[in-house]
Amino acid sequence: MAGYLRVVRSLCRASGSRPAWAPAALTAPTSQEQPRRHYADKRIKVAKPVVEMDGDEMTRIIWQFIKEKLILPHVDIQLKYFDLGLPNRDQTDDQVTIDSALATQKYSVAVKCATITPDEARVEEFKLKKMWKSPNGTIRNILGGTVFREPIICKNIPRLVPGWTKPITIGRHAHGDQYKATDFVADRAGTFKMVFTPKDGSGVKEWEVYNFPAGGVGMGMYNTDESISGFAHSCFQYAIQKKWPLYMSTKNTILKAYDGRFKDIFQEIFDKHYKTDFDKNKIWYEHRLIDDMVAQVLKSSGGFVWACKNYDGDVQSDILAQGFGSLGLMTSVLVCPDGKTIEAEAAHGTVTRHYREHQKGRPTSTNPIASIFAWTRGLEHRGKLDGNQDLIRFAQMLEKVCVETVESGAMTKDLAGCIHGLSNVKLNEHFLNTTDFLDTIKSNLDRALGRQ
């Protein structure tokens, strides 16, 4: 979120009252099914539900507009609603987050608004019972799976890497390695050893890591065959869905056993389960060394899926986001190993600084596109699972309308800043405020659907 907020740090300061479409407060109904409104009869019928996870702050307000103005007037769908706003997570002792993940397991598709992960300041601000864990982490721990980030490309938004003319999707194995490691400071000379004690009672194995002649640091880390296998299945499934080649990067020349295990598991699963489908789609899987892969990515035009270990994915996903231009144009989809269950959301946070301006009654210029794409990616997947071609076409049409709207020159301040520089842009000359931009997308969508 910090990167996104830096991009959009300069807000529209024009005076004005709260936009008419914006809810007056953060609170919302917590029931799983919200009251049905009266919409046109010619909506696309959707047979099975989608789980909706509401969120916090500015993204929550935009989320409501997207649902009421862009989705529900055209799609007749049952939404299993869960309020993951921080006040309700606190009120339910975070049970609502667990319930939303279990519902996603049941219905296979979820769309999620950005949420606050509380720190000490948020605990004080919201008078929370405790510092609740990241809802994304809780959901991921229940569902498993891999988070794939993919940029939304608009031709008129400059890229730091101009050659990236097609998207690059990065899949991060968000389990183990450095993030679950045990590290320590050795404050004197001594021997650092690793010991493995098998549960079956067989012989203990011991490795001497280093003999410290003086102070230093040490670390032990791990991963599991089960987690690596789930990661591999998610990556292969996603590549087949996108019809893009898949690259997996490690440093197995140095970590021969550790990274070599990643390489071997991926290859075994590919050969056994996915090679036929890859050949059928004329795509390929390839393992590469991480340093070679980074160089190849910079030279490439895009159009592939990149599977990264935990640390590599953490670093490289931020590089990709900046290289493509903006976190406001980055989607995030959690894909489970079954290839059927997904949860889609925006890659950015709740846009707190804009929400503070909104609370003062001032208009903002907040980019809603990644939140719109959370809805479209979820609906498109629902359509694929159900064989609902009308729903798939609608989701693709809404995405196309968003991109074409930006390419026509109508955009929010963060995107205008990418083109002209934030210090040079002016309201209604280079960018629109939030409500006007959303209204423009709505008008363009209505026009596009009317042409069908």
Swiss-Prot record:
Known EC number: 1.1.1.42
Residues the record lists as binding NADP(+): 115-117, 122, 299, 349-354, 367
Cofactor: how bound: Binds 1 Mg(2+) or Mn(2+) ion per subunit.
Keywords, alphabetical: Acetylation, Disease variant, Glyoxylate bypass, Magnesium, Manganese, Metal-binding, Mitochondrion, NADP, Oxidoreductase, Transit peptide, Tricarboxylic acid cycle
Compartments where found: Mitochondrion
Principal location: mitochondrion
The organelle targeting sequence, given as a residue range: 1-39
Site (Critical for catalysis) residue list: 179, 251
Pfam families, sorted: Iso_dh
N6-acetyllysine PTM sites in chain numbering: 45, 48, 67, 69, 80, 106, 155, 166, 180, 193, 199, 256, 263, 272, 275, 280, 282, 384, 400, 413, 442
Effect of residue 413 to A: 44-fold loss in activity
InterPro entries: IsoCit/isopropylmalate_DH_CS (IPR019818), Isocitrate_DH_NADP (IPR004790), IsoPropMal-DH-like_dom (IPR024084)
Disease link: D-2-hydroxyglutaric aciduria 2: A neurometabolic disorder causing developmental delay, epilepsy, hypotonia, and dysmorphic features. Both a mild and a severe phenotype exist. The severe phenotype is homogeneous and is characterized by early infantile-onset epileptic encephalopathy and cardiomyopathy. The mild phenotype has a more variable clinical presentation. Diagnosis is based on the presence of an excess of D-2-hydroxyglutaric acid in the urine. Glioma: Gliomas are benign or malignant central nervous system neoplasms derived from glial cells. They comprise astrocytomas and glioblastoma multiforme that are derived from astrocytes, oligodendrogliomas derived from oligodendrocytes and ependymomas derived from ependymocytes.
Name of the protein in question: Isocitrate dehydrogenase [NADP], mitochondrial
